[in-house]
């Protein structure tokens, strides 16, 4: 989606010309959930003057009730009209930053926090941090009450075509809606698991790319519903098949120059690229809870399902955490393969960027690339070459996060503490549950 710049007068003009009747002021909470305040277009001037207030105490991880007043400051460049709204008037969306009553950015706003980390990047001489995400999702049928079932929409596989891929019509409509909203769609296809799909859209600067991910999720769920399907970004909804990932392809720029590219080295990579990679590898255990935030996330990060379990990097090999795709020049990038689509994109990207900057600032040395299939190596072989495991549960991921000062810096005290507290409660709740699997295994035997 190309970067656009709008003024207040532009917004007024668009609202009138398009017969906009409602405005959705959108923001994202710490858990990655999209929130919005909907107001009639008669409130447009208050919106443009940053005067729209909401109760922050009602949002997960924001503030206590005695300090709850928050203001929404819209980013005018995020103006878009939802294509599926018409009839009595259209609905327009503006993504907002959250501000406190004293006029300063709220430290618990993930979008504002990402901007803070980007400022740190700029202080090191870089101008842009670009992200190209690869989000995957499943489509399940709805029952007669409109509730999701476990019945898949098809039994297709990787890149399968119709008639096997019965979700093709839904996926096509999603692509059309996204294009109407300004997305530059690069690929759309069936993924490995039945009912699993991937739609890739063009990279963008860090904040815009994260905005696009949140918009993408909303569009996918909305259009799926119109096809009597439920779209889920749950990382591992089914046993025995691949889970859904959201690989992050990232690159640093200095002006128009890709800071990761050097045509005169063996792999075409700069020392900056190696240092950034080293920082990501060093801090990977610490940011795993942010990039894989659900109990369910760790059902995906197991051997045998094309998801990374081990902390290593390679140029071609897809089994490590980090891969360096073969494209060079302006397209030079590193691919962080552990991220799943349940992650808050603003927080995940802030953590990965801070980890990479840690490598650059401290001139960390990257280990040797691993070009063999790590899944086929035993523990002794992995340990011999210094390959660590990613955390295998949310509990161990939170433990690693508590021990990592770089990730604490990436998120800031407020988000860091609120996230750990919320996720610790989630883990404790899960830990005390009794599952159907346990009853099936033990009820009769004991």
UniProtKB/Swiss-Prot annotation:
Inhibited by glutamine. One of its GO terms (molecular function) is ATP binding. Its EC number is 6.3.1.2. GO terms for cellular component: cytoplasm. The record marks 64 as: Important for inhibition by glutamine. Gene3D superfamilies: Glutamine synthetase, N-terminal domain, Glutamine synthetase/guanido kinase, catalytic domain. One of its GO terms (biological process) is glutamine biosynthetic process. It is an enzyme of class 6 (ligase). Keywords: ATP-binding, Cytoplasm, Ligase, Magnesium, Metal-binding, Nucleotide-binding. Residues 110-446 form the GS catalytic domain. Mg(2+) 2 binds at residues 136, 191, 198. Its cofactor is Mg(2+). Residues 18-103 form the GS beta-grasp domain. Binds 2 Mg(2+) ions per subunit. Mg(2+) 1 binds at residues 134, 247, 335. It holds the Pfam family Gln-synt_N. It catalyses: L-glutamate + NH4(+) + ATP = L-glutamine + ADP + phosphate + H(+). Belongs to the glutamine synthetase family. This is Glutamine synthetase. It comes from Staphylococcus aureus (strain MW2). The gene is glnA.
